[in-house]
């Protein structure tokens, strides 16, 4: 049995959700989590900077002798998948499972994608959804003002009130 940990990383702490699911489904596995709270959020940065950070994050985990890497960051999954595929250990990200869940759950073929500027600009989620479903009706929206408060709450524990107000403003 391979006792090395599974490495999980995100640009902040949002990937703790993925880590929690790993713990639930693989309770006997060791997990090493890296949340890059010093450079969060990645999604407002340029593609090459995101790729640089992702490579550094992946290399950090490899140096800690992980047996697999999970990029629990939608932005990294969108713009740096090829870097993960080049790792010497199995690589997983959140793009395909997220797109598959959206396709499976829609009842009318309409799918909304919210994400960082880099995620939306990459078109990765749209392409994956279109690969999985015939003629989906995909709507994409960059939510600058919502994603930062989510990151801030994760980092500081500050109330979600501002996030709710911002989200309400977007639907008016």
Task: Put a short name on every predicted segment.
Residues 1-172:
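Non-catalytic structural scaffold of enzyme domains
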